Structures are given as structure tokens and as C-alpha cells.
Amino acid sequence: MAPSALLRPLSRLLAPARLPSGPSVRSKFYVREPPNAKPDWLKVGFTLGTTVFLWVYLIKQHNEDILEYKRRNGLE
């Protein structure tokens, strides 16, 4: 196969994109109400509850690890 035949498809890939214009073109995106207008309070509650739970668990685990470290090294 000739090298020019291989370069033809590549030149199409490297060419700048052209956007179709005219009244027949439809947008792929629809204008909708922003998601912040009506928050899903159930998701908000689960998210905040999970966050609080994870922070409490992290701090509790950290304190247990500190006590274990002190016990093993004779610092307590």
C-alpha cells in the first residue's frame, strides 16, 4: 500500500473540526433546571451522615493507634 494512501485517513484526523451550521442542526444538550435549584435532601443527608461517621471513626481509630503506640514503646 502506498504511503499516501495511509496518510489520507490520518490527515482527516489531524484536520481541525468543523461544526455544522444552519437551522437543521440540533443541540445534543437540553436546557434544564440547574441541579442546585431543588436539592435531593435524602442524598444530602446520606452524604453528610456518612462524612460525619467517617470522621468520627477516623478520630477514634487514631486515638486507639496513639494509645497502642505509647503502650508498645513504654511511653505510657
UniProtKB/Swiss-Prot annotation:
Subcellular location: Mitochondrion inner membrane
Function in brief: Accessory subunit of the mitochondrial membrane respiratory chain NADH dehydrogenase (Complex I), that is believed not to be involved in catalysis. Complex I functions in the transfer of electrons from NADH to the respiratory chain. The immediate electron acceptor for the enzyme is believed to be ubiquinone.
Transit peptide start and end: 1-27
Principal location class: mitochondrion
Assembly mode: Complex I is composed of 45 different subunits.
Keywords: Electron transport, Membrane, Mitochondrion, Mitochondrion inner membrane, Respiratory chain, Transit peptide, Transmembrane, Transmembrane helix, Transport
One Gene Ontology cellular component: respiratory chain complex I
Membrane topology according to the record: Single-pass membrane protein
Similarity annotation: Belongs to the complex I NDUFC1 subunit family.
Entry protein name: NADH dehydrogenase [ubiquinone] 1 subunit C1, mitochondrial
Transmembrane region(s): 41-59
